[in-house]
């Protein structure tokens, strides 16, 4: 543009445009000058630019006056396109920013400036938004009402000016979206003043009416006519919005925050600024022109916006007087030209309409888009179809910001799903949609009718507010729903993937999620202001009814969900969880609803409002499924899905923070709400309730909460097929309580679960949960809850029916009673112990116990038939008291050991040794994990040799029993009570074989040292060699336990190493007393030798393990040394090295015979390794390291040697060692010291019994 155009634009201030004084002063000369301006416009470059400017101003003022008059006559511009809902606030804001589109339209169409206006304003164009845009407003406003005049003003100027104005206007719009700069604000404000005055005022009026409609459901009638007039006259329609969206992308790019991404913090700030503008402008203009008071939020916006108007101080004062005339003029222009229809092509006028979607549209848009779809489907007259197309277009167009493409695709899918779901919802709740559709001839009419029809039900009351807001969102939905549908989809995707996995049968969840995304918008927008206040009231009432219903239907569930909801409510700040809050809101919304208006605060508040209002809107979505969610949610399944979806999305969003807890709660509440709505899903309610309770118990952990969320989701998905698992669990529990057989039956049905109902329930739940999630299974059920429920069940288990009680697993080994008498006596106490023990036990362990206990029960039944009623307890001296041949006792002992081990494992679940340790006094030593795994495998391998009964049990028992038996029979030296243990295969030994009961009380090294010395002194005093060797071996076992205690104690690792090394020497000495290799060697001798070799092998292995770090260091040091030494001075061959290194002649080197030289040199080097002639000189440090390294590594060699020797001897005594392996679990090189000690003590006890030693 030339300097004249620039000067003209600069001088075209809004002050002149809005200044009443100037207008009044120049009214007389304006007519003539306007005519002259036409010719002068053709000669833009005439020198008298000042005159042109003056004339132009006068012309504009005249046009403004004329337009204002004519505009007043046909004011109805934005009848339907602009929802009266609070979403209009966003519309006003956006229109404030986009309000210049009417003016821009002419320039775009006539000057082909669309590229500038449609696209992001070119930075090259000077952005003097205040003056130029003011001029632009004036020029455009003139251009529309009097394009010829505009053209006459300046043939070239119009083009340049429009371009600049378009650019500046676009930039002004951007800035209007973000009113940071005064000029920008001015431009945006002025442009938006016109657009808003035309569009915004109509919208505000419509909004006010809609608000009233929200409240009364009647005022919408007023608005529809006006809106209809506007709609028909101006051509602005929600339908037009899709084009606006098309142009909007650039606008979105310019200020996406204004309306493109309602969920984003960006729009929130821009929303506030646009809101202020639209509110003040719309409030002032609406009040001035339509006489329609802005809504309370609008008044607030007006206040805020007034503040913003104050920002552009240049034209603000002059504008204030002329605002009305200008606004009227603008409105008239908008009305005159139905430029909106023309602007629709530019697709910016529509964005100007969308401007209101900023927050409200965001909030309402999603909801509205859904309701509109619902309305369209139900057959809502204009808005339904237009909104549906608009929604689709908007979703597609508004998505171009960032996720636009994804959102568009998702929304398209969502629409398809939503359509199907809408059809379902329409079918299910067709009456409400139809009533809404029928009632809503216009968006406001639809809202009023929908509110009327929906006020019928509590949920419908929510629908009412949401539908009205959604209708106001009619134009908004495209932006908001697409942006928010996008966040919703993104949020839902994370959880949707999850839910889809869990509940693949519920695509409605996705639909609902996306709908929730829009619903979030609804949540945010409607609750934010108008709906938050107006609709909030109705929803609150309806919500109260819903609350009553919900309380009735899901009192307990609701309690938990509401508790969760409370958290979400408090977490409403989390904002992203609103969708989840939606579900929660459905459940807990009633309490949250009152806060919805409060939440109408800015974006963050919006999100929080999103939660609480989300509840409202969720109800609205559920209740208004026809309007909001119905399009996307099938009623019953979708409601369920919606509840799931809502939670799912929030969880997705919530993963950001403590949202999980809120999510879980929201899931519960949403589940509750959905359940209420679907009623048919009430069965799910108890199940979810169970899970919720479980979750509440386990809610302490976020993972638990997640799992619980998953559980709920799983429950939702699974609930239709299964009536409440909770009920099943309860029934199973009751059946278990009724009888052990029943409990076992329930276990069988549930899947081998522990005899204890708790384990049944836990396993059942676990199975269900496992289908959901492979991880966190132990956490799915809160151990507290399980333990509580299980306690009664455990107590009800009739222990008297069991000759042996493997369930003592949870008991302390001391509590375990080997004799049947002890079993019966200690059964109650031990059983009581078991309950708490299992409580402590992780779920997995419990499950394991369950499986094992089932097997044990079977074994017990068989054993109960076979076992003799009484068992004798051996004296602490390991004396066999009586021959109690209980073939099954052996198998029973295995389960007992296994169970004991299982119970022990909870103490240190990570260490197999703990499991084995079970009763070992060396609980501290149980930390060693290495031994048990191998033992288990070994035991499983050897177990096939076990009795047929044991083999049948082997599947579960061998695994657990071997592990447990490895550690289960810990040695309690002074307390070796014997249980008659009869291997089924060895009937002759049945009377002799008794199982020792090991006391697993943790004891200090000093205790074991005393015991070892006592046994050693006893052995020293004995004369009989075999008995002496036995006592030495037992003393060695005590020394091993002492070393193990040292190893686990505070003492340095060297102490146990020394103890083990001394023990090795003691065992070797004991073995020398009684040889096993001679022809006179007895089987007992060989058996004792095999046990001693086992001990030696493990001792050496353990010694190496203790010194392994040192060995590694030594190895590295030696390798480095030799590597470096070889490089520094390569050792010469024996015959050539003498002269090289020392220079002194070597007597051997002259010898021609290399052999002699080698021999002599070899002897020389061997005799004196440091001999300089050999270069083998090694530092003392290296020599010592080599020696230590060799001694350490030799332990491995010794270990394997002794192990092979023990295996050879064991093969010669397979019967004995098979029985021992079955009872105690096989010993391997990786067995723990505790297991080794118990294993050896049991074997020594049998040997002592076989030779009748006391």
From Swiss-Prot:
Sequence ranges of Polar residues compositional bias: 67-76, 143-158, 359-369, 421-433, 873-883, 922-941, 960-985
Main location: nucleus
Region (Disordered): 45-90, 139-190, 261-324, 350-534, 552-752, 813-883, 919-991, 1128-1171
GO cellular component: cytosol; nuclear body; nucleus
Domain of life: Eukaryota
Recorded GO MF terms: DNA-binding transcription factor activity; double-stranded DNA binding
InterPro entries, per database record: AF4/FMR2, AF4/FMR2_CHD, AF4_int
Keyword Hydrolase among record annotations: no
Composition bias type Basic and acidic residues, residue spans: 45-62, 552-561, 615-633, 857-869
One GO term (biological process): DNA-templated transcription
Keywords: Activator, DNA-binding, Nucleus, Phosphoprotein, Transcription, Transcription regulation
Modified residues (Phosphoserine): 782, 908
Low complexity bias locations: 406-418, 441-472, 577-605, 694-704, 732-749, 1132-1146, 1154-1171
Family: Belongs to the AF4 family.
Protein name: AF4/FMR2 family member 3
Organism this protein belongs to: Mus musculus (Mouse)
